[in-house]
Every structure is written in C-alpha cells, then in structure tokens.
Curated annotation (Swiss-Prot):
<feature type="repeat" description="TPR 1">
    <location>
        <begin position="35"/>
        <end position="68"/>
    </location>
</feature>
<protein>
    <recommendedName>
        <fullName>Photosystem I assembly protein Ycf3</fullName>
    </recommendedName>
</protein>
<keyword id="KW-0602">Photosynthesis</keyword>
<feature type="repeat" description="TPR 2">
    <location>
        <begin position="72"/>
        <end position="105"/>
    </location>
</feature>
<dbReference type="InterPro" id="IPR019734">
    <property type="entry name" value="TPR_rpt"/>
</dbReference>
<dbReference type="GO" id="GO:0009535">
    <property type="term" value="C:chloroplast thylakoid membrane"/>
</dbReference>
<keyword id="KW-0677">Repeat</keyword>
<keyword id="KW-0793">Thylakoid</keyword>
<comment type="similarity">
    <text>Belongs to the Ycf3 family.</text>
</comment>
<keyword id="KW-0150">Chloroplast</keyword>
<dbReference type="InterPro" id="IPR011990">
    <property type="entry name" value="TPR-like_helical_dom_sf"/>
</dbReference>
<keyword id="KW-0802">TPR repeat</keyword>
<dbReference type="GO" id="GO:0048564">
    <property type="term" value="P:photosystem I assembly"/>
</dbReference>
<feature type="repeat" description="TPR 3">
    <location>
        <begin position="120"/>
        <end position="153"/>
    </location>
</feature>
<dbReference type="Pfam" id="PF00515">
    <property type="entry name" value="TPR_1"/>
</dbReference>
<dbReference type="InterPro" id="IPR022818">
    <property type="entry name" value="PSI_Ycf3_assembly"/>
</dbReference>
<dbReference type="InterPro" id="IPR051685">
    <property type="entry name" value="Ycf3/AcsC/BcsC/TPR_MFPF"/>
</dbReference>
Amino acid sequence: MPRSRITGNLIDKTFSIVANILLRIIPTTSGEKEAFTYYRDGMSAQSEGNYAEALQNYYEAMRLEIDPYDRSYILYNIGLIHTSNGEHTKALEYYFRALERNPFLPQAFNNMAVICHYRGEQAIRQGDSEIAEAWFDQAAEYWKQAIALTPGNYIEAQNWLKITRRFE
C-alpha cells in the first residue's frame, strides 16, 4: 500500500488531504502526479526515520520528475538522509546537485557549512591545524552564501564568522 494512504497523526493526515486535493485541481501530467506521490511518500518515511524507504521513494521521484526546481528539493532531501547517516561526502554531493538546479536553497549551503565545520573539528582532533583551517574557511564561504540568501537566519553561524574574523 502506498505510504500516502497510511493513516498517521493529524498533521500527516492533513498534509495528505491537502496534497491530494491540490493534485486533483492543479493541472499536472500523470508523471508529475506520480513523482509528487513518491516525493510525499519519501518525506513521510524520512520523518519516521525510515531512510531506506525514503531513499527508494526519492530515487523513483527523481526518475519521474523533470522540473529542475522540484528535483532540487528531492536531491536536498537525499542529502539530508546521507547527512543523518554520517555519509558526509555523499551528502555534499547531493547538496551540490540540488544547488546546481536551484541556487536559492540557503538550507543546502548551511548543511554544507555544518559538514565542513565538523570536518574542521575532526582535523583539529587529529592535530592537523592546516587542514582544519581549510575546512573552516570552506564552511565560512558556505555560511556566507546561506546568510546572503536569508540575512535574518543562521545567527549562530553569523556569530561564529564574527568571532573567527571570517565575516566581511
């Protein structure tokens, strides 16, 4: 049974009802509807921590979806799953791919910055300050891009940039 037909909490039920109504009234092709159904099912599985199921749905949505903007969100969510699984190299790849299709995803820039910052901290623990600085510099660049897109957000990142004198 498709996940979208599974009953859940009130928010999930409401989202499913609204999504189904929109799919009926907005002129879309059957392929677009099917892609959205897989995307919605992927989001549902992801929110429950069922990452393998979510990835299957997202890959199927990617196969069907042709709109670059919509594909960017599918790729972003795949990146989130890889981040959650500690697969940072894969996550960065998917965030990059999402940004290629939609350069206005501050959350992708933020997540890339967080991964780079984490790798910088790992390098410090391993005693490699030169590599750490390179990772921190890269994190700073990504955070600057996220902040440029949404100036009121990412306050902690803004503070880190100021404290480390990386904010221009």
